[in-house]
Amino acid sequence: HRKGATRAFPANMDDVPAKYRDLGQPVLVPGSMGTGSWILLGQENSMNTTFGSTAHGAGRMMSRSKARRDFTESEVKKSLNDKGIFLKSLTRDGVVEETPQAYKDVDAVVNVSHELGIATKVAKLVPIGVIKG
């Protein structure tokens, strides 16, 4: 079980799907709705240092209840709109609980995996729209 983590197997492992076996396990690392996400590829050092695992997301640094107290729906929407990110949500809580300020810096999280040879950065995905149910 990988609590708080996801597979980052290197190339040439039987457990990596055949179409990715020459590259390594694709790893998706989501950030916040305002910062984007990363695509990585698992590397050999992951097997020696982290049991073939890496972070599965930026991770929260603020509780949902604190985010509800500290942020308003309008300020989160304005912040995203100022970055050119369209936001559609059915609820106020869906907006404020997921404010980008509630999450760690996804770039810093990914850089740790990259620098330690656990997973290699392939592409950064930049948000253009967010839909919260």
Model region roles, listed by residue range:
Residues 1-133:
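Domain-length cofactor-binding catalytic modules of enzymes
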